[in-house]
Structure formats: structure tokens, C-alpha cells
Amino acid sequence: MEIENHKEEVPFAHYEGLFRELDPREVTARVTDVTFEEGAFRVTLLGRTFAISHPDCVFTALDGGSLPPLPTRTFLLRYLLESKTLPFGGSWKTFREMPWGEMYIKPYTGRVLTRAAFTFGTRVNAFRAAAQKLGATALSHGDAGFQFDLIGPYRMQILVWEGDDEFPPNAQVLYSENFADGFAPEDRVVAGDILISTIKANM
């Protein structure tokens, strides 16, 4: 494969190589929401199920829709390679409160918090409609707030506040506490990015 977009294609090619060496039995024992059927892993992200053939790593959207962008496919490969099923205990954490959160807070703030604030806080009704379309659970916090089932037992909440003449729009993103041990910090950033992009695509 000729690499043109190094920022996205080089990481994908790296994890694609590791994916080819996976033992499907080890993966499905470690990540119990994933199944392996007819030579392919099946994994559900934000309500959409994808088949990823093994070992050749061909993605198929089982709903017949479009394939996710390359960073999302890389995220799914990393989920199969590195994550594990950890039960959700019912508590929530900010990104900063999780391990290495302070080190990654600057890219996280730009890619997730600021983006969520100005994408959704300026169009609260459209955000609400998109979240409902995705099957999210409405929350009583913020001007609009919703809880999303991201992948497996991992949940995320987005709360938005509409801006006015005095204050800019604002947003908070919360992670189910199992993210702290189930995902590397860079994957928590990507999870926020994926969630925002998915909601935006439905607005």
C-alpha cells in the first residue's frame, strides 16, 4: 500500500499488521462483547455493527451503510488488540481524572471539549434531535445532555450549555469509570472525537 496520508494511514497499517497475528479465541475471551463468526470479528460501535475479516482485515458495515473513516477503523483495531471487558460500576470520570489525563489534556480540550461546545452549544435543538436519533438516553443536566453506549460496556455522556451574549457555549464530556483501565489515554481522546463526529453527522 502506498502511504499518502501519513497521519492516518501509517497508524492504520501498523495496527493492521498486528491484527493479522491475533488469535480470535484470545480476543473473544478478553473482549466479551466481540464475536468471531465466519472468519470475521463482529464489533458494535455506537449502534452500528461492523465485520472485520481475519486475517485480511477487510471492514464491512453490516447495516449496508458507509464504512467509518480510517481513524475510527484504527480505533476498532486497537480495541480488539488492547482493550478488555470491564464492567461499568455506575460512576463517571472526566478525562482529566483518569490516568495520564493531565498529560493529554491540551489535545483533548481542543479535539473534544471545545469542539463539542461550539458544534452542539450553538445548535442545541439539532444536537438533541441527533442524540435521540442515535438512541441516546436523555439526562437532566445542562441545557441538553445525553448518555451514549459507545462500545461494549463503555459509556459516555455529553452535556452542553448554550452560549449567550455574556458567556460562550460550553460542554462537558464524562466517561464511565471503566475507561480508566480499559483504554489508553490517546484512545479516550479518539473516543470523544468519534462520538462528536457521529452526532454531528446526524445533525
Region annotations inferred by a language model:
Residues 1-39, 72, 80-134:
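Short Lys/Arg-enriched alpha/beta "domain-start" segment
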Residues 62, 66, 117, 144, ...:
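Short, charged/polar micro-motifs that form catalytic or ligand-binding hotspots
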Residues 122-181:
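Conserved binding-pocket/active-site segment within a compact domain
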Residues 48-74, 161-186:
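Intrinsically disordered, low-complexity regulatory segments enriched in Ser/Thr/Pro
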Residues 27-54, 137-162:
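Amphipathic, interaction-prone secondary-structure segments
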Residues 67-88, 174-203:
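Ampiphathic alpha-helical segments that act as solvent-exposed interaction surfaces
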